[in-house]
Amino acid sequence: MKVILATNNRHKVKEIREILGKALGETLTLEEAGVHADPEENGATFEENALIKAREICRLTSLPALSDDSGLCVDALDGAPGVRSARYSGGGSEENIALLLENLRKAEERGERDRTAHFSCAVALVFPDGREITAEGRTYGYITDRPMGVGGFGYDPVFFSTELGKTF
């Protein structure tokens, strides 16, 4: 069975193939399938956004489509950046991290010292016959004072995983 990976993010493609490659069988990127689409992620939750993308790509290709939506939720910022994680600053990863750290500094100035956070990831697999499977998971940690570690993408350099004992 062929499955379309409903993302234009090459980092996500790499991670999905590393984690789920054998379980999914043959996977195609949007580029490999000749699909030029970037559905608007306007859902209120990670699951809604994952479903929006998977449904649209499944509709366009008539193949099963796997999508994810993930983001960082910081307790001191009332869950921000949340579902807007990738678009938090209006720029790229470095700008998003800079804005996140600045907003945490402002929160600390107001007496809010909690830096706990979690990453949420929702995945959706949509089939041409209308079946939909979703799942959501979280990993917990806190935000560091500055970027650390090597590799990763997005907020990985500032998210310290309490489970792993290091930044992503």
Protein language model regions, located:
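Anionic-ligand binding patches
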Residues: K2-I4, R10-F168
